[in-house]
A protein has these predicted regions:
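N-terminal, membrane-interfacial amphipathic/helix-forming hydrophobic leader that caps
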Residues: 2-10, 15-119, 123, 129, ...
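Residue-level signature of the transmembrane alpha-helical core
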Residues: 125, 129, 164, 168, ...
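Hydrophobic alpha-helical segments and helix pairs
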Residues: 142-177
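Active-site-proximal inter-transmembrane loops
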Residues: 155-163, 221-240
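Membrane-interface helix/loop boundary segments of multi-pass membrane proteins
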Residues: 173-205, 209-222, 259-263
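Hydrophobic alpha-helical transmembrane segments
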Residues: 174, 242-251
Length: 337
């Protein structure tokens, strides 16, 4: 009888299988499950890094005093232990972030090598070096800085190796974290403006750690005290400008490059070029009395805290925004599920 026909017979040939033949909801592929809120994952990650780093630093300091007393490691200022604890936990925290979907693979995160990668890398390196070289040229030409007289050749080669190493290592880690994982994961749920603002704000924040004096003694909770003093630069609003604007603009430009090219090679190149020239600026030049008087314009040895750097990098950002134009057609690597 018709009511006794099974589901396949009622459906007829070529029809989709009945519901009982489909996997149960709990067995559906993982991509069909609701994703964790990236903003919540980011807050949890930051909380774990800062709280864990503050708790870990005193133990590492005590361990160094017990195992290698009087060594260079044991004599490092306590803030260095806090710095390294934060960095170590930030790197270790990348694994659970990857498990939460923040590292969908080297291609999706932006570090796969493609036909345009070499051109983007060279363009970024050229733009990064040229922009800060322009700041240095202005400072030297107007008497705010002077060349360091006759650095020894061996010392110069040491600087070159260290500057290149720092440029590659720091740029790779920061671009992977801030533009690859943080911005990329936020971008898959939120608009470019929201994603770039959050990732750039975090990027700027970590560059405003103070270097406070060592504590009188180190105890289990000294890490929290030191961390509070390191973050105290945010309480002095006047000292934030123009550095916070410059770093925020840098973060926004790097996010824009990630958005427009679909990869991290252009932002990596820019970042590496800036770090290399920043290290070279510190090594090859010294401040003059005129530069000290115009510190608000020329900035300190950190370079990004002067208005001259802000103006030059703002012009650099305009050039790159105009040159990149519209996003690649069909590029959905940042917004697809």
């Amino acid at each position: 009888m018709p009511d006794r026909l099974n589901a396949t017979q009622r459906a007829g040939p070529g029809s989709p299988p009945p519901d009982r033949d489909r996997p149960a909801p709990m067995n559906r592929p993982i991509q069909d499950r609701p994703r964790l809120n990236p903003a919540g994952v980011l807050c949890g990650y930051l909380l774990g890094v800062f709280l864990g780093g503050a708790l870990l630093a005193p133990w590492l300091w005590s361990l160094a005093q017990a195992l290698v007393p009087g060594s260079g490691l044991a004599q490092q200022p306590f803030r260095r232990y806090v710095d390294r604890s934060l960095l170590g936990l930030a790197l270790l925290g990348l694994w659970p972030m990857a498990r939460a979907g923040w590292f969908p693979g080297w291609r999706r995160v932006g570090f796969s090598w493609g036909p345009c990668s070499a051109r983007e890398l060279v363009l970024g390196l050229s733009g990064g070096v040229a922009s800060l070289a322009a700041v240095a040229a202005l400072a030297l030409g107007l008497g705010a800085r002077s060349w360091l007289p006759h650095p020894p050749a061996g010392l110069f080669m040491t600087h070159l190796v260290r500057a290149i190493g720092a440029a590659v290592a720091v740029s790779f880690l920061e671009e992977l974290l801030f533009r690859g994982m943080v911005f990329g994961s936020l971008r898959r749920r939120y608009s470019f403006a929201v994603s770039a603002t959050l990732s750039s704000g975090l990027f700027a924040m970590i560059h405003f750690f103070r270097r406070p004096d060592p504590p009188a003694s180190v105890g289990p909770w000294t890490g929290f005290e030191m961390l509070g003093r390191m973050l105290g630069g945010w309480a002095d609003v006047r000292s934030l400008f123009p550095g916070i604007l410059t770093l925020g603009m840098i973060g926004g430009l790097l996010a824009w490059c990630r958005e427009r090219t679909g990869s991290l090679w252009l932002p990596f190149g820019l970042h590496a070029g800036w770090i290399f020239w920043f290290k070279s600026y510190q090594f090859l030049t010294v401040a003059t009395a005129r530069g000290d008087r115009g510190a608000r314009w020329w900035g300190s040895i950190r370079l990004h805290d002067g208005w001259a750097t802000f103006v030059v990098l703002a012009l650099t950002a305009l050039v790159f925004v105009r040159a990149l134009g519209k996003p690649k057609a069909g590029d959905d690597r940042l917004t697809d599920g």
